[in-house]
Amino acid sequence: MYRRLASGLYQTSQRRIAQVQPKSVFVPETIVTTLPNGFRVATENTGGSTATIGVFIDAGSRYENEKNNGTAHFLEHMAFKGTPRRTRMGLELEVENIGAHLNAYTSRESTTYYAKCFTEKLDQSVDILSDILLNSSLATKDIEAERGVIIREMEEVAQNFQEVVFDILHADVFKGNPLSYTILGPIELIQTINKNDLQGYINTHYRSGRMVLAAAGGVNHDAIVKMAEKYFGELKHGDSSTEFVPATYSPCEVRGDIPDLPMLYGAMVVEGVSWTHEDNLALMVANTLMGEYDRMRGFGVNAPTRLAEKLSQDAGIEVFQSFNTCYKETGLVGTYFVAAPESIDNLIDSVLQQWVWLANNIDEAAVDRAKRSLHTNLLLMLDGSTPVCEDIGRQLLCYGRRIPTPELHARIESITVQQLRDVCRRVFLEGQVSAAVVGKTQYWPVNEEIHGRLIRMQ
């Protein structure tokens, strides 16, 4: 699925949580320490001889502006090109010699750099992460070389219609806000980004109050804290709200007309909620009830939902996948699809009927099945030190803490049928539909028609 999508959790009232006794699920404790400069260290000792350790930064494309969009992603490319202490070749050789693996990725709200290594090489790995993050050489020749690499990456993204759909959707539904920016940035800015732009972004956003050092695997918390003090202890705190501009959802209908495409690629959405909104877990249950289907891969890891079973009978529908994307103050919830033009009406009507069913007719048996599936999926996502490390870092940035598994289980179990119906009614039936489609777009109806269909179904 779209690599920049994310699910979220929410904070319910203690009254609701108290009604449910958490089931016993053994998971190691996540320990968190905050250094005097605001830099947070979070670890989970899952055992073993290897570990994953990463730096998670509250800085992504939404913290950019119309003059430097693409800088966060450009920095991701530059991080591995050398520092005053380590040449590019020396860095690559050092990482290889200790048997480590370095990686990085950028999203709209955050940037992550992490290393997978043997436990005895954790200190050296943190040294490397700190060095490439804070002391990158940003040599002109390397900037020019990576400029070409990024432009080629942009050309590849332009051929990935799934990426295109979500980029044009964000561009219109959050128009006028940095959340609308693409992660790679426009080509005209990529061609002009220079060392001053890159260094300025580091100085502004790579601050201790906006960073988390997370580790999972065979790790000792006190030892990791000492590493953080050694390599990040002198980092300035910074302002956690720097250049954050709250986004407003604006209903849109955006079309990328490509007449030669045999299929229509698109997303139909309504406004979702933020990471911390009290309705988010209910929407995650609803998302599970919507389901997914891919003609090449089947129904995914879960049993097919009623919507998936219905759409699988239509030979013109290649892919549909529900999603719940969360940001700090808003979100998008809906369905991504790949379908033949003659199947579009069936697809739209089937999704709308499912929305109405969720809001008006969902029963306890279906909700219970969805909650069990959600429990299982969330636990399966944490198989290995790398996904655990990523989950720790993400939750620290989103919630300020790691939500314990028993607490999360209790929150999911506390969702009632009526609560789910109420949330789905507010979000799906009372929300305003937006759509982004690529292909033979004349086969996609206008938003007013879709809204009219939804009204008639109720």
From Swiss-Prot:
PROSITE patterns: INSULINASE. Its main location: mitochondrion. Its EC number is 3.4.24.64. It is found in: Mitochondrion matrix. Signal peptide: none annotated. Binding to mppa-1 is required for catalytic activity. Inhibited by metal chelator ethylenediaminetetraacetic acid (EDTA). GO terms for cellular component: mitochondrial processing peptidase complex; mitochondrion. SUPFAM superfamilies: LuxS/MPP-like metallohydrolase. Zn(2+) binds at residues 73, 77, 153. Residues 1-41 form a transit peptide. Disruption phenotype: RNAi-mediated knockdown causes 54 percent embryonic lethality. Embryonic lethality is further increased in simultaneous RNAi-mediated knockdown of mmpa-1 and mmpb-1 or ucr-1 and mppb-1. InterPro entries: Metalloenz_LuxS/M16, MPP/UQCRC_Complex, Pept_M16_N, Pept_M16_Zn_BS, Peptidase_M16_C. The record marks 163, 167 as: Required for the specific determination of the substrate cleavage site. Binds 1 zinc ion per subunit. Heterodimer of mppa-1 (alpha) and mppb-1 (beta) subunits, forming the mitochondrial processing protease (MPP) in which mppa-1 is involved in substrate recognition and binding and mppb-1 is the catalytic subunit. Belongs to the peptidase M16 family. This is Mitochondrial-processing peptidase subunit beta.
